[in-house]
Design a protein with these regions (language model features):
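Surface-exposed short loop/turn segments
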Residues: 74, 80-124, 130-143
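C-terminal motif of bacterial Sec signal peptides marking the signal peptidase cleavage site
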Residues: 21-24
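Bacterial N-terminal signal peptides that target proteins for export
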Residues: 1-14
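C-terminal/domain-edge helix-coil "capping" segments
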Residues: 139-167
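Sec/Tat-exported extracytoplasmic proteins
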Residues: 61-65, 112-116, 135, 159-167
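Bacterial signal peptide processing site
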Residues: 26-29
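Solvent-exposed, acidic/flexible segments
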Residues: 50, 54, 101-105, 145-154
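N-terminal segment of the mature soluble domain
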Residues: 37-85
C-alpha cells in the first residue's frame, strides 16, 4: 500500500514539474483563431479566387467564424492579396546536366485594411520545399510536387492566420 502511494506521488510530482517546465518555456496550446472585431465581415481581394492559397485562406477564415463577403462595400475589413506566385526551380543537376533536385516555392504579398485604416501593413511571405527528381519516377514525382505545394499553402495560411491573431 505504501509502495502504491509513493508511485502515485512520484507520478503526480513528475507531471507537475513537466507542466511547469513547458509553461516556463513559453509553450501554449493552440486554441481557436482570434480575429480582430474589424474582421467580422471580411472581403478577400484577390485576382484568382480559385488559387490554392485563396481557397485555403477562405476555408480557414470561415472555420474561424469570419463571415467572408462577396463585395468590399459589405465588408468591415479587406484582406488584399496583391501578389501571388508559385513555381519550381532547379536546385541541382547531374553530371549529364539532368535536374536531380527541385525547389517548389509559393510567394504571397498581402495587407489588411479596416475601413480607411490599415491594420496590417503589406507583408511578403515565401515558403519553399525541396525534392529530389528521378526521371524514372515521373508520375510519382509530379504527385510529390503537388503534395508539397498543398503543404506549402497550408503553411502560408497558418502564418497569415497567426499574424491576424496578433492584431
Amino acid at each position: 500500500m505504501c509502495r502504491a502511494d509513493w508511485s502515485t506521488s512520484l507520478s503526480r510530482s513528475a507531471a507537475i514539474i513537466l507542466a511547469l517546465l513547458i509553461a516556463g518555456c513559453g509553450f501554449q496550446m493552440q486554441g481557436a483563431l482570434r480575429t480582430p472585431p474589424e474582421m467580422a465581415r471580411t472581403f478577400i481581394d484577390v485576382d484568382d479566387r480559385n488559387s490554392l492559397f485563396a481557397r485555403e485562406l477562405h476555408a480557414q477564415l470561415q472555420r474561424a467564424d469570419v463571415d467572408i463577403v462577396d463585395t468590399a462595400t459589405a465588408a468591415t475589413a479587406r484582406l488584399s492579396i496583391t501578389y501571388e506566385e508559385t513555381d519550381q526551380r532547379v536546385l541541382s543537376v547531374s553530371a549529364r546536366n539532368v535536374p536531380t533536385e527541385y525547389e517548389v516555392y509559393y510567394t504571397i504579398q498581402y495587407a489588411i485594411d479596416a475601413g480607411e485604416r490599415r491594420i496590417l501593413e503589406s507583408q511578403t511571405l515565401t515558403v519553399t520545399r525541396n525534392y529530389t527528381y528521378d526521371s524514372t519516377l515521373v508520375l510519382g514525382k509530379a504527385r510529390e510536387e503537388e503534395l508539397l505545394r498543398d503543404a506549402i499553402v497550408e503553411d502560408l495560411v497558418r502564418i497569415v492566420l497567426k499574424q491576424i491573431a496578433t492584431l
